[in-house]
A protein has these predicted regions:
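Generic alpha-helical secondary structure signal
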Residues: 107-110, 211-214, 270-274
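Cysteine protease catalytic domains with a Cys-His-Asp triad
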Residues: 1-185, 191-199
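Cysteine protease-like catalytic core of ubiquitin/ubiquitin-like
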Residues: 158, 162-262
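Residues that form generic nucleotide/phosphate-binding pockets
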Residues: 112-116, 215-220, 279
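Contiguous terminal or domain-adjacent regions
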Residues: 250-283
Length: 283
């Protein structure tokens, strides 16, 4: 790497296909500029329809809408499901057509981030959690006081390192589990150097780390004395809808090797997040 470090990942650096297809060559101005499905799928579908160039139109889909293409393709449902999981980004919710900045739910976030876990063996996405993740589980039988999200409460960085993991991501909502949700934030743990891990907290509004997450971060210092903790103080978000997108973008930048210090030096806009929705979710 040269002396100038990247501060952000550009939209053009993020594949519109499943991220494990990052090596796929895209030729602008051709059908392949929006193609994620393999040629063999197009050949199979085109046997009973018009030529490739008119395939989307003949099936009643807009050009490049490969989820729509599979909906109407003469293929077995199990094959369609497999193709979606292997090649395509998660499907863009229909409600976004009328409300393009609709709040992300936990499933939207989980579906996107789990694809990165599939694409990058050294990365694990631990999950999407409420702020009371460490509270006793109210649904536990016999009144046992067990952590609501045990996988997070029991997270051991050294164990993860020995499993081959070098980055761990997670997203939190600042509401407890019994409420409807208020604001998404993210945590990323860099364990490339297990002797000096870096745990960084990101809030798109730049607010202080909530006490429960701060306590979790301090717990990693108890595991590894030289663990470094950090948070962003810069405000990125100025609207009220894109906190989930900002949280995912932060983790994606960390996965791409952007340093936390560089990432926090300047912000990206809410409009950038709206454009990113069109990349991370497809039709």
């Amino acid at each position: 790497m040269g002396s100038t470090q990247k501060r952000k990942v550009a939209l053009t650096d993020i594949s519109r296909c499943h991220p494990k297809m990052k090596g796929k060559k895209i030729v602008k101005g051709t059908r392949k500029s929006h193609q994620c499905l393999p040629d063999s799928v197009y050949h199979e579908i085109s046997k009973s329809h018009l030529s490739k160039n008119g395939l989307f139109q003949s099936l009643g889909c807009n050009e490049g809408e490969e989820h729509c293409l599979l909906d109407k393709a003469p293929l077995d449902d199990s094959i369609k499901k497999s193709l979606r999981r292997q090649y395509l980004r998660p499907r863009r919710p229909k409600g976004w057509d009328a409300d393009p900045d609709m709040w992300l739910d936990n499933y939207n976030i989980m579906h996107v981030m789990k694809q990165y876990e599939e694409a990058i063996p050294s990365f694990t996405f631990l999950g999407v959690f409420p702020i009371d993740f460490s509270a006793p589980n109210p649904y536990q039988p016999d009144g046992e006081k067990k952590c609501l999200h045990k996988e997070l409460c029991d997270l051991n960085l050294i164990n993860e390192y020995h499993k081959g993991k070098r980055g761990i991501g997670m997203v939190f909502n600042l509401d407890p589990h019994y409420k409807g949700g208020s604001h998404w934030v993210a945590l990323y743990i860099n364990i490339v150097n297990i002797n000096k891990p870096f745990v960084c907290y990101f809030d798109s509004y730049g607010y202080d780390t909530p006490p429960l997450i701060a306590r979790l971060m301090r717990s990693f210092k108890l595991q590894i004395k030289n663990c470094h903790l950090g948070r962003n103080a810069r405000r990125f978000q100025y609207g009220n809808s894109e906190c989930g997108m900002f949280s995912m973008y932060f983790i994606i930048c960390m996965i791409h090797g952007i340093s936390f210090k560089q990432f926090c030096k300047d912000s990206v806009s809410d409009d950038f997040m709206l454009q990113l929705r069109k990349v991370l979710f497809s039709k």
